Amino acid sequence: ANGDLHIKIVQKQPIARVINKYGVNYYINENANKIPISSKFTTRVPVVTGNIQEGTYNSNMIETPVLKNVLTITRFIHNNTFWNAQIEQVSVADNGSFVLIPKLGDHKIEFGGIDNMEEKFHKLEIFYAEGLSYTGWDKYETIKLDYKGQIVCEKKINYEQE
């Protein structure tokens, strides 16, 4: 009771930047909080776009089922050193499935839903290490993970191996 005031400040760490269907931008953190965008600072995190339907920025918490799935997949990416370095964008398709855009390579990853998420990422990591390192990062247009136990790739139409 000596008149001292103690303040504890905890900075929220964003794991993704969301741009919803209506163009509203905000960050999300691991605790399912929405964080307003700052005009003075940008955090390097994956950008999430696509069919994210919600109203205006009126709630500070993630509440819709689509956003809960976004949180699940972006939390996994954020906490995995390999995928955090690889994934640049996460897009939500109209049916709620995910399409991942990597930083390296000129392909998209049709991830599907978050069911068996860890297994899908594990198989994709093996494919990156044992497949793409031999065939090249630009051979495929699409890598599809939404088939149980399989990775299906579509070659680029005009791909020519050097």
Label the model's feature ranges.
Residues A1-E162:
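Charged, solvent-exposed interaction patches on well-folded alpha/beta domains
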